[in-house]
Amino acid sequence: MKKFNVSTLRAALPDGRRMGLRVLLGAALLQTAACSFAAEDAVSIAPPIKDEAVKTAGTETAVFAGGCFWGVQGVFQHVQGVKKAVSGYAGGKADTAQYERVSEGDTGHAESVEVTFDPSQVSYGTLLQVFFSVAHNPTELNRQGPDHGTQYRSAIFPESSEQKAVAQAYIAQLDSAKSFNAPIVTKIETYNGFYPAEDYHQNFLTTHPTYPYIVINDLPKVGQLKQLFADRYSEQPVLVK
């Protein structure tokens, strides 16, 4: 069955129409190939053996890239202890951190989410566990579901040496345990800044729950979060204001 290359098709259109195209493609998928493009089942994985030292005050930030930021943001907005989850861009330079440019796939940016969290309520290691098991498929190289390109790569941008050590150890742990059917391709990249995405991308899953793309690819992830992390799940999402 021929698969739609959403990223290539939408790159030819202005931002507003790209979103419309994503909806039209989603509708087509619902009618002709919904099963092929539905969000993959989440994988139940062990928590990290190595985690950050327990912190009792303040907040911390973490940046994750795992395909289209709509779904990744939507998942983390439902995790207890998360104070904010912002869609944006990481990996490239400030002057190319715009959706239209990033969609061309040559900026070095990945669609990313910056998660602000209270480490006394949820650890960085737990966020990694959610990221790998629910938010995306870490075995897909430069793609997630119907979206293709380096801007959809699986990546972690540690903001400290401790975050980097925890992420490296967890990837090694999961690969050693053969937690997935294929090796993890997630890259640990240098953090050089995070650039928030345009306003119309923020809270997209919550504000557009009937968009076919969201219905097929992203809402199932929130359901899987609730199922696998019932003790961590928050019914009310923490929205960007």
Model segments located where?
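Flexible coil/turn and secondary-structure edge motifs
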Residues: K2-L9, L13-G16, R22-L25, Q31, ...
